Amino acid sequence: MGEFLELDGSYGEGGGQIVRTALFLSTLLQVPVRIYNIRAKREKPGLKRQHLNIVKLLKRFAKAKVKGDELGSIELEYKPQKLKPGYYEVNFDTAGSIPLFLQTILPLSLFVPGEVVIKVIGGTDVPKSPTIDWVRFVFLHYIYKVPEFIRLEVLKRGFYPAGGGIVQLSVRNKLEKQPENLQEVKEYLKDKVNLYRTERGEIRKIHVFSVAHEELRERKVAERQAKGAIEALKNLGYPEPEVYRQYANANSIGTSITIWLEDTKGNVLGADNLGKKGKLAEVVGAEAVKKLHEDWSSGATVDRHLADHLIPLMALVGGEIRVPQFTGHLLTNIWVCEQFLGKIFEVDEKEKIVRTQGIS
């Protein structure tokens, strides 16, 4: 293999997902990685600020030695050391996506010996990304049993274009040292993460979380987004949801809505949407319901965002999920994991199932 595991960043859909997953696995497994042709198929190839923000933290969090960490760079060499507990702060200086940043950093925080607090300043609810509430109420559901303590707090909302949102992740683990090998990783996660999820139950609860900038309070935008979602859910035959409405001060005016359902088998699926100028608040809510309904009515046990988030964890601990659809994103994510761990995934496109025993 040489000093670095070589990854072609143009493989498959060739996007930033390759970078995010590779940095997670490289850091956890202590495998240096060289990614070339980064985002080569995109209109603006190379590393984006959101990827550099992850690297910026990992240079401290994992004492990583890095080459090529520049805006637009099509090659990155990354050599991590062990994760260090402590307090870290990262300021994006843009409305870059905090949820996509956390796709790498949040799972890594589960393997830090002791306590880690990470404060991030950027975008909490921005385009081409899940909302921060989706991370809090959907993704966290699958991993919260791993640490002794975990809290993900939204201290301030950050909408596009100004950003300035503040999120703080606090984690305390019962670990004296970072797992040394694949078997220790699997053993640590074994009884805390259950990703064998092909069975569905009845819908137990539905939640609607509607957020709008404080300046939109008079126009009752948070209420109207929620109303659009409630009516759409009712028209599709879903149970009445629990509704949360919030007005927030932020550097830019914006809105978001996140909807998630829980079933009796312990599955949680979510969807979200952002408001924009000229779009009725009621439509924003209804569109979020449409996304959730598309995923749930497909027979899936995970939503479209969740599949990407769970694949790297499945590679470590094993799992079986039913996805809404096979996307280039999903298949590329599987490919990245298999570059580190060998051929471990099985894909059943007819049944829309992804399964793996994980590392052996």
From Swiss-Prot:
SUPFAM superfamilies given for it? EPT/RTPC-like, RNA 3'-terminal phosphate cyclase, RPTC, insert domain
Q: Name one GO cellular component term.
A: cytoplasm
Give the superkingdom in one word: Bacteria
Q: Which InterPro entries match?
A: RNA3'-term_phos_cycl_insert (IPR013791), RNA3'_phos_cyclase_dom (IPR023797), RNA3'_phos_cyclase_dom_sf (IPR037136), RNA3'_term_phos_cyc (IPR000228), RNA3'_term_phos_cyc_type_1 (IPR017770), RNA3'_term_phos_cycl-like_CS (IPR020719), RNA3'P_cycl/enolpyr_Trfase_a/b (IPR013792), RPTC_insert (IPR036553)
Q: Name one Pfam family in it.
A: RTC
Which residues catalyse the reaction? 329
UniProt-annotated location(s):
Cytoplasm
Main subcellular localisation: cytoplasm
User: What's an example GO BP annotation here?
Assistant: RNA processing
E.C. no: 6.5.1.4
Protein residues bound to ATP: 103, 305-309
Which reaction does this chain catalyze?
a 3'-end 3'-phospho-ribonucleotide-RNA + ATP = a 3'-end 2',3'-cyclophospho-ribonucleotide-RNA + AMP + diphosphate
Keywords attached to this entry: ATP-binding, Cytoplasm, Ligase, Nucleotide-binding
The Gene Ontology terms for molecular function here are: ATP binding; RNA-3'-phosphate cyclase activity
Q: What family is it from?
A: Belongs to the RNA 3'-terminal cyclase family. Type 1 subfamily.
Q: What does this protein do?
A: Catalyzes the conversion of 3'-phosphate to a 2',3'-cyclic phosphodiester at the end of RNA. The mechanism of action of the enzyme occurs in 3 steps: (A) adenylation of the enzyme by ATP; (B) transfer of adenylate to an RNA-N3'P to produce RNA-N3'PP5'A; (C) and attack of the adjacent 2'-hydroxyl on the 3'-phosphorus in the diester linkage to produce the cyclic end product. The biological role of this enzyme is unknown but it is likely to function in some aspects of cellular RNA processing.
- Identify this protein by name: RNA 3'-terminal phosphate cyclase
Please give the organism. Answer: Aquifex aeolicus (strain VF5)
Q: Which gene encodes it?
A: rtcA
